[in-house]
């Protein structure tokens, strides 16, 4: 019935000729304010036809709800109470911390070799060709890896693609940084392609990102980041990088976001579990968790530079 309408914002939506369909709850409230009777219809109207037309109009409104929501002003967010948690039975949410670690370690992509020919000197063109070919082949494996990240395949195909589109360069970069931890001052793009910053200089503008990647690898080394922590961080990048750029605020989209947040909580709990197992005190665990998550903002910054 009409009383079931719920304003997804603050019950103060603007209802005028152009925006009367944007929020049924506020539209109904405005009707009451100007004298419409609750629980009935005005006696001076022929009820049957009015109700029939109203029902048809509401069905049409509901069909267009997705498009309508996208036209709303950005600060009108649907209420969390509207989310039904229809993905709460996702297998990912019932995994233990150890099971998540095992799944992520098993999901790790295979090693990819570059087509580097040591007999040919680097030029800007040859370096870019090498790196883009390498990235292309890594991206194929990245898709298979993402499908094995707990909770990822529970999302719609559209949202899986969206998250990968947002995060692919950050994921490539964290993999590069992780591989390079044992090579101070160098970046290990592939087992047969280890570059120092002087070689990086041959691509215009590349040395700035090169230095940032080296600094991040140095931070990983200084913190003694473990492989289990690395796979958790990489999964967090996949799930988190695109979560705030979903195009719509429809209920379906909100349920997807809610699911992602729940999986992210599981992965963060897994990181804390790993730290507790390593013997860190509660305070040390929280500090290390914060330090690891702070590093992720640098990957976002580097990927924005790299685009």
UniProtKB/Swiss-Prot annotation:
Single GO molecular function: DNA-binding transcription factor activity
Chain ranges of zinc fingers (NR C4-type): 7-31
Cell location: Nucleus
Species assigned in the record: Aspidoscelis uniparens (Desert grassland whiptail lizard)
Annotated region described as Hinge, given as residue ranges: 44-95
Function noted in UniProt: The steroid hormones and their receptors are involved in the regulation of eukaryotic gene expression and affect cellular proliferation and differentiation in target tissues.
UniProt KW Nucleus keyword: yes
Keyword list, A-Z: DNA-binding, Lipid-binding, Metal-binding, Nucleus, Receptor, Steroid-binding, Transcription, Transcription regulation, Zinc, Zinc-finger
Matching SUPFAM superfamilies: Nuclear receptor ligand-binding domain (SSF48508)
An annotated GO cellular component: nucleus
Protein origin, superkingdom: Eukaryota
Domain named NR LBD: residues: 96-307
Gene name tied to this protein: ESR1
DNA-binding positions: 1-43
Similarity remark: Belongs to the nuclear hormone receptor family. NR3 subfamily.
Name of this chain's protein: Estrogen receptor
Entry's free-text remark on domains: Composed of three domains: a modulating N-terminal domain, a DNA-binding domain and a C-terminal ligand-binding domain.
Quaternary context: Binds DNA as a homodimer. Can form a heterodimer with ER-beta.
